[in-house]
């Protein structure tokens, strides 16, 4: 290998490492970024970092859960601290499981959760504890895996990641194949994976970036001691001309690059030059992080302003791909920018990803609607029914039409079952028994 080729490969390797580091920085919370930069400053005399002293933390609220029956109108500022993982899950179970037997089994699964959010016991053991058949327990588990945050109740890392990708509407055959071969990913065997997926290695690398943006332990967003994990990175306020988005700069570490002069020692000066170059790169990487996060949040708020004004019924269909296209970024960049982040709103703290919502084709000539909004509507209609005369699915279709939503009966049935709401017959029987 000649010197020119060696230098070219060395430069490419350095660029790849910096790209990976830049992606890591993008995904860090403000607190993680402060820790990271502080550690870098200890090793780099040209990097000065000022970390703000403890700032106030806004009260946290449950994460996105319309699909599991959690009404986002409940996102209102509350006193106190965020719930533990168990409390968060139990709150969703109370809303999603009407049948007492199903709820008992669901709570048994909740008790088996590890702090990571993974299921800590075999399904057979949970079924035995709940005194139900294993097949019945598996049905309940599938419903629990639709709760938020996505990835809870997984039995393996691959399943945890697959649940998150499915929730985002991004789970392709290629990604599923990659998750089925995680050891190859860990070993960096890109070529082998490309052959198995019948695609180019570059496509594997793009998918790998998306996988790395996911949370392997979604339960860690909650604390057993009920203390906030992290403050919001972004806030949205109502201004004179509409909603205004800003970064929570009180939480942001400040960087300064020292321009110390030469020492007169060739080796020392060369080392200082490299340190100064690294410090400047870190400064630019943090600036890019802030700009990407702010642009993404502004785009989300612009598209979902009605959600902030009116609540979950006003959510519009919006995907990561649409936002990425609008901002001229890769979807994996949007995924990283929004992963685990909270935005402070007049409704309280909300996961930034709550602003995404899957599109559902209308059963009529109307434009596609948000699945979350339609499911919220179905739940709202059922919540206000006369318990002794519950609405049938056909009646819900008529009520939805009065609210301006065109739904087929089969769609109502699907949403009702996803929400864990029994049929009108079973609801009437339960009301009579009560």
UniProtKB/Swiss-Prot annotation:
Pfam families named among the record's database cross-references: Sigma54_AID, Sigma54_CBD, Sigma54_DBD
GO cellular component, one term: DNA-directed RNA polymerase complex
Keyword Transmembrane helix: no
Record key words, sorted: DNA-binding, DNA-directed RNA polymerase, Nitrogen fixation, Nucleotidyltransferase, Sigma factor, Transcription, Transcription regulation, Transferase
Segments traversing the membrane: none
GO molecular-function terms, A-Z: DNA binding; DNA-binding transcription activator activity; nucleotidyltransferase activity; sigma factor activity
Entry's Gene Ontology BP terms: DNA-templated transcription initiation; nitrogen fixation
Residue ranges for the DNA-binding region feature of this UniProt entry: 319-338
Sequence motif RPON box, location on chain: 408-416
Gene3D superfamilies xref list: Homeodomain-like, RNA polymerase sigma-54 factor, core-binding domain
Family: Belongs to the sigma-54 factor family.
Purpose: Sigma factors are initiation factors that promote the attachment of RNA polymerase to specific initiation sites and are then released. This sigma factor is responsible for the expression of the nitrogen fixation genes. The open complex (sigma-54 and core RNA polymerase) serves as the receptor for receipt of the melting signal from the remotely bound activator protein NifA for the expression of the nitrogen fixation proteins.
Name recorded for this polypeptide: RNA polymerase sigma-54 factor
UniProt source species: Cereibacter sphaeroides (Rhodobacter sphaeroides)
Record lineage: Bacteria, Pseudomonadati, Pseudomonadota, Alphaproteobacteria, Rhodobacterales
């Amino acid at each position: 290998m000649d010197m020119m080729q060696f230098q070219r490969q060395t430069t490419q390797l350095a660029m790849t490492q910096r790209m990976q580091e830049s992606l890591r920085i993008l995904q860090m919370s403000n607190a993680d970024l402060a820790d990271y930069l502080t550690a870098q400053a200890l090793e780099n005399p040209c990097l000065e970092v000022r970390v703000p002293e403890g700032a106030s933390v806004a009260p946290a609220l449950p994460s996105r859960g319309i699909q599991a029956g959690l009404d986002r109108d409940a996102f209102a500022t509350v006193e106190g601290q965020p719930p533990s993982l168990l409390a968060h899950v139990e709150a969703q179970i109370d809303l999603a499981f009407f049948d007492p037997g199903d709820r008992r089994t669901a709570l048994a699964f909740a008790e088996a959760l590890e702090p990571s959010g993974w299921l800590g016991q075999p399904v057979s053991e949970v079924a035995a504890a709940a005194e139900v058949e294993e097949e019945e327990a598996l049905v309940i588990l599938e419903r629990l895996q639709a709760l938020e945050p996505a990835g809870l109740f997984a039995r393996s890392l691959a399943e945890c990641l697959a649940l998150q990708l499915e929730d985002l509407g991004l789970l392709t055959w290629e990604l599923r194949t990659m998750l089925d071969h995680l050891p190859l990913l860990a070993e960096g065997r890109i070529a082998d994976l490309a052959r198995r997926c019948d695609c180019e290695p570059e496509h594997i690398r793009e998918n790998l970036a998306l996988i790395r943006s996911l949370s392997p332990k979604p339960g860690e967003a909650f604390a057993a001691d009920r203390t906030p994990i992290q403050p919001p990175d972004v806030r949205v306020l109502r201004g004179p001309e509409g909603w205004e988005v800003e970064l929570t700069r009180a939480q942001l570490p400040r960087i300064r690059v020292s321009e110390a002069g030469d020492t007169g020692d060739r080796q020392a000066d060369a080392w200082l030059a490299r340190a100064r170059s690294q410090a400047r790169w870190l400064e630019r990487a943090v600036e890019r992080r802030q700009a990407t996060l702010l642009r993404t949040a502004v785009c989300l708020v612009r598209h979902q302003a009605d959600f902030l004004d009116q609540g979950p019924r006003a959510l519009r269909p919006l995907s990561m791909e649409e936002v990425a296209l609008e901002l001229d970024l890769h979807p994996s960049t949007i995924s990283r920018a929004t992963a685990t982040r909270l935005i402070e709103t007049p409704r309280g703290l909300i996961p930034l990803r709550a602003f995404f919502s899957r599109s559902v084709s209308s059963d009529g000539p109307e434009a596609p609607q948000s699945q979350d909004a339609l499911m919220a509507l179905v739940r709202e209609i059922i919540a206000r029914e006369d318990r002794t005369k519950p609405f049938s699915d056909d009646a819900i279709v008529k009520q939805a039409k009065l609210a301006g939503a065109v739904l087929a009966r089969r769609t109502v049935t699907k949403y009702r079952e996803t929400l864990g709401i029994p049929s009108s017959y079973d609801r009437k029987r339960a009301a009579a028994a009560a």
